[in-house]
Amino acid sequence: MKERSTELVQGFRHSVPYINAHRGKTFVIMLSGEAIAEANFVGIINDIALLHSLGIRLVVVYGARPQIDTLLREQRCDPRYHKQIRITDARTLALVKQAAGQVQLDITARLSMSLSNTPLAGAHINVVSGNFIIAQPLGVDDGVDYCHSGRIRRIDEAALRCQLDAGAIVLLGPVAVSVTGESFNLTTEEIATHLAIKLQAEKLIGFCAAQGVCSDDGSIAAELLPNEAEQRVSALEAAGKAAQASTRFLRGAITACRSGVGRSHLISYLEDGALLQELFSRDGIGTQIVMESAEQIRRANINDIGGILALIRPLEQQGILVRRSREQLEREIERFTLIERDSLTIACAALYPFPQERMGEMACVAVHPDYRNSARGEQLLQRITAQARQMGLEKLFVLTTRSLHWFQERGFQPVEVDMLPQQKQALYNYQRRSKILLTEL
């Protein structure tokens, strides 16, 4: 009998909204030289090919910093940098070309594999490289001559779009040519950032050793706004980590985000399948830089009925919440506040005012099972409390059968039924025997 995997089925079903959302979008993926040197590089290439098969338009920008440094040391030359940028003299440029050429051939070969026993079976991917970027010299800075290190002068956007429209993966490295026929060594971060901005890409994705950006408590920050990301970058630079791939990418991600790129993602090249987990799951696995949070807390409207019902029905069936019909929800929808993440309602609560007694009831508090160990309940309580104060209410009460201690930890005190508004006392269900807790606003 064949083995059945419900986990596979559920995972695939949950990924469908993201597959549909990403189809036809442009992603710029930055592969640092460190990522290419790792054993998981083959898995990353397979995942990139999978994105292509799902109809995502891909530009892959690769680096070769450690590979170049290795060649230099073999030649008994020390790598030289100024402000995190390589000083590329004529001898170094030759080694840059050698390393970049080797990496490009390796990536192209991997993406061209189509054997029947490989993840790329039947893929037939066209990989295109070319002079899409025109460079110019960096020149002299602080008395330091960068020699053949350069920066972007212009990008041939029309030619890039033509290749993407034809279904090709565009592969670009750190070497670009100039109008004078010279070659220049550019930073991978600059190329990836400017390409994402020029193409108005949906996403800029970078790989580093860490799983993402660490929060103050040591956990991975799921998302950062540009100002928050800048603070993290400043802290990393102050700690002497300016040269790290993650720090360099974050600088570019901040610029891209402020220039119209939807989201920038930082994920680990050490984690197998990190690219797929980041793009096809609700919470991802790394850190994303966004202008606007993927998670919002707002007042509900009539279009949210379905999402709220899906959230509260299991709790109603368990007897935790009092059952509400769709019709009742439609009548009372303006009472509800919800937290939404990627179009999914993950938490909700309602505020029922009793103006005569200057009291309000916080009711129908529900949090999605995946988020119950987070701060979503706290966020809802803060928002409902703020709304109650705006209404001129002086007290807030709840009726609960399961969350007595949670509310007590937040300043609510147990009271008797006679402390409720008269209208609420008349409706109190003595069979349900809900605990009543009240707090002063």
From Swiss-Prot:
Q: Does the keyword Acyltransferase apply?
A: yes
EC class of the enzyme, as a word: transferase
Q: Which GO terms describe its cellular component?
A: cytoplasm
Stated EC number for the protein is 2.3.1.1
Report whether Cytoplasm shows up as a keyword of the record.
yes
Q: Which reaction(s) does its UniProt entry say it catalyses?
A: L-glutamate + acetyl-CoA = N-acetyl-L-glutamate + CoA + H(+)
Where does this polypeptide localize?
Answer: Cytoplasm
Gene Ontology molecular functions: L-glutamate N-acetyltransferase activity
Domain named N-acetyltransferase is located at 295-434
Question: What InterPro entries does the database record attribute to this sequence?
Answer: AceGlu_kinase-like_sf, Acyl_CoA_acyltransferase, Asp/Glu/Uridylate_kinase, GNAT_dom, NAGS_kin, NH2A_AcTrfase
> This protein's superkingdom?
Bacteria
Metabolic or biological pathway, per its Swiss-Prot or TrEMBL entry:
Amino-acid biosynthesis; L-arginine biosynthesis; N(2)-acetyl-L-ornithine from L-glutamate: step 1/4
* One Pfam family from the record: AA_kinase
UniProt keywords, alphabetically: Acyltransferase, Amino-acid biosynthesis, Arginine biosynthesis, Cytoplasm, Transferase
- Gene Ontology biological process terms in this record: L-arginine biosynthetic process
**Which NCBIfam families does the annotation name?**
N-Ac-Glu-synth, PRK05279.1
| PANTHER family hit by this protein | AMINO-ACID ACETYLTRANSFERASE (PTHR30602), AMINO-ACID ACETYLTRANSFERASE NAGS1, CHLOROPLASTIC-RELATED (PTHR30602:SF12)
Q: To which protein family does this belong? A: Belongs to the acetyltransferase family. ArgA subfamily.
Complex and partners: Homohexamer.
Protein name (Swiss-Prot/TrEMBL): Amino-acid acetyltransferase
Taxonomic source organism: Edwardsiella ictaluri (strain 93-146)
Q: What is the lineage of its organism?
A: Bacteria, Pseudomonadati, Pseudomonadota, Gammaproteobacteria, Enterobacterales
